Amino acid sequence: MAYEQEVWVPVTGLGKKVMAGEFASFDEILASGQPIKEAGIVDAMLPDLVDEVLCIDMMQRMTDSGRRIKFRAVVVIGNKNGYVGFGQGRDVQVGTAIKKAITNAKLNIVKVRRGCGSWECGCGMKHSVPMEVTGKAGSVAVTLKPAPKGIGLVTGDVGKKVLTLAGIQDVWVNTSGNTRTTLNFAKATYNALRETNLIRIGGRK
């Protein structure tokens, strides 16, 4: 889903460095360890990002002045080549909730380590995950296991959308908990992908 972007005027030190061209790649920004607090930084360094709205929920709350309704949007973004982000946004307008979710996802973008971790394959290409990883959110746990080339994404539709935008083509997926909850299923899948960059090959962090 495409939204017209406003002209970005950086306000943080990192944003000003990006605008000045001091970073050659997004990897350099991540390696610097500086927190990303502006979505414009991500837009500037990863212009090929695609966003996918996973669900929109109506939330009601009773107040002294009556019932108030807000919408919650859950969004995943990625460039289908090793970067993925997950975000939520709330607002009284659906469109604004989606925009907030996209911005939140950009601030939560992570690099996904890909590889060929299946003993059945060994092609050496970056089509799967390099090791088994698990992510959790609420009652949901999602475990990603390396799969040989050609297997595809063995998971539900929500998981497929998250994995596809991350650039994963083949993976076995085990789940537990209430996976019918789109928010937790998507977030657990995202958290599992984030683990690929936190766990060293060999199993130790």
Swiss-Prot record:
GO cellular component terms given for this protein: cytosolic small ribosomal subunit
Gene3D superfamilies cross-referenced by the UniProt entry: 3.30.160.20, 3.30.230.10
Entry keywords, A to Z: Ribonucleoprotein, Ribosomal protein, RNA-binding, rRNA-binding
Keyword RNA-binding assigned: yes
Domain S5 DRBM: 49-112
Subunit architecture: Part of the 30S ribosomal subunit. Contacts protein S4.
Family: Belongs to the universal ribosomal protein uS5 family.
Full protein name: Small ribosomal subunit protein uS5
